[in-house]
Every structure is written in C-alpha cells, then in structure tokens.
C-alpha cells in the first residue's frame, strides 16, 4: 500500500517538474491571456474570426447586420444593395402590419412602395471574396 502511494506521489512530482520551464517557473498551457478562460477573440477561428476582426474595424463584409434605415423620402431613399440590376424588396409599411408588400426595385431611379410610398434605391454591391 505504501509503495503504491509513493509511486503515485513520485509520478505527480515528475509531472510537476515537466510542467515547469527551464528557469523553474510554471509554464502556462493555455492560449488565454493571463491563464484564464480564453476570450471570444482568442478562441474564434475561420469565418467567425474574420467576421469579428471586420466588426472591430467597423466593417460588415458578409451583410450580417441589419441595413441602415433611411427616412424613405425621395431625397433620402432606403438603399438596397444588389449584385444584379434588380432585386425584390419587402416593405412592412406600418409597424403593426401583418402582411409584407413585395415589389421589384430596378437599377436607376428610386422606386416607391405601391402601398405606403416609401422610396427605395438599388445600389451596386460587391461580394467579399
């Protein structure tokens, strides 16, 4: 029984020594700054990391955020990004409306919603590659 305890204690001591660096200070084996739980930025990889880095710079390369609403007048229309020369748009018209009014917006002049008269304008958009 005693030999089993001594063997376990010796293995634990050897493991502790291996975890220390050459100067005797314990090596942190975590990617987190400060040895705690990693932050979202430290743990994110791939597309998630790319989106987080772009958001930090104030960019939205994959159109994840809601579009910025304008006043909807002819002078200040709602901008509709599109990679083609037309796009279908849905207008709710009123806050408590239960139906969506769908219509096509074509490149060029601003177009109005047939129901409420809100103006929309198609703008060219390039995909992020």
From Swiss-Prot:
Keywords: Acetylation, Membrane, Metal-binding, Mitochondrion, Mitochondrion inner membrane, Transit peptide, Zinc. The keyword Mitochondrion applies. Belongs to the cytochrome c oxidase subunit 5B family. It comes from Sus scrofa. InterPro entries: Cyt_c_oxidase_su5b, Cyt_c_oxidase_su5b_sf. Its main location: mitochondrion. It is a peripheral membrane protein. GO terms for biological process: mitochondrial electron transport, cytochrome c to oxygen. The modification N6-acetyllysine is found at residues 68, 86, 121. This is Cytochrome c oxidase subunit 5B, mitochondrial. Pathway: Energy metabolism; oxidative phosphorylation. One of its GO terms (molecular function) is metal ion binding. Residues 1-31 form a transit peptide. It is found in: Mitochondrion inner membrane. Component of the cytochrome c oxidase (complex IV, CIV), a multisubunit enzyme composed of 14 subunits. The complex is composed of a catalytic core of 3 subunits MT-CO1, MT-CO2 and MT-CO3, encoded in the mitochondrial DNA, and 11 supernumerary subunits COX4I, COX5A, COX5B, COX6A, COX6B, COX6C, COX7A, COX7B, COX7C, COX8 and NDUFA4, which are encoded in the nuclear genome. It comes from the Eukaryota.
